[in-house]
Amino acid sequence: MIYIDNRQNKIKVNEELENKIKEIIDYALKEEKVNIDYEISVVFIDNNSIKEINKDYRNIDKATDVLSFPMLDYEDGEVFKDIYLNYEFDESDLDEGNLVLGDIALSLEKAEEQSKEFGHSFLRETCYLTIHSVLHLLGYDHMEEDEKVIMRQREEEILKSFNLHR
């Protein structure tokens, strides 16, 4: 189950965008071997809202593009398919039968700014940020160079499957 909640009014959100976000999340999770019913919440916000969240959770007082709040625990360098592929989740891990993977806060205002800066479509930038965040929910990171290379490769592979190039 993918929940999308638009809490901003600076960028128009249409059904096409919401459907593409859901489609790309579902595809990424299948590619990453998430073989259980799941729940992810995506909240579209503006720069002011994401700045507040970034300050509250990361002590960084500036707007960013996307923030991820994973619900599962991962050891350094391990991802969902390494740990949870055949894991037996019990009822306390589930919400109405769905594994809660986490929440995504995405600034559509920042996505629009970055799409212009990088010279590609708003849809491509929003999908990229969504995939980036979903991979964080699955344990991927980019703090170390070797992890960054792996994460960027997965992002690009998923984007190419949707014909979304830079």
UniProtKB/Swiss-Prot annotation:
Known EC number: 3.1.-.-
Cite the InterPro entries for this sequence: MetalPrtase_cat_dom_sf_prd, YbeY, YbeY_CS
Report residues binding Zn(2+).
Answer: H132, H136, H142
Q: Which cofactor does it need?
A: Zn(2+)
GO CC annotation terms, alphabetical = cytoplasm
Q: Which BP terms in the Gene Ontology apply to this protein?
A: rRNA processing
Record key words, sorted:
Cytoplasm, Endonuclease, Hydrolase, Metal-binding, Nuclease, Ribosome biogenesis, rRNA processing, Zinc
Give one GO molecular function term. metalloendopeptidase activity
Cofactor comment text? Binds 1 zinc ion.
Where in or outside the cell it occurs: the entry states:
Cytoplasm
Q: Which PANTHER family match?
A: ENDORIBONUCLEASE YBEY, CHLOROPLASTIC
User: What does it do?
Assistant: Single strand-specific metallo-endoribonuclease involved in late-stage 70S ribosome quality control and in maturation of the 3' terminus of the 16S rRNA.
Q: Which family does it belong to?
A: Belongs to the endoribonuclease YbeY family.
Q: Return the protein name.
A: Endoribonuclease YbeY
Q: What is the lineage of its organism?
A: Bacteria, Bacillati, Bacillota, Clostridia, Eubacteriales
Which gene is transcribed and translated to give this protein?
Answer: ybeY
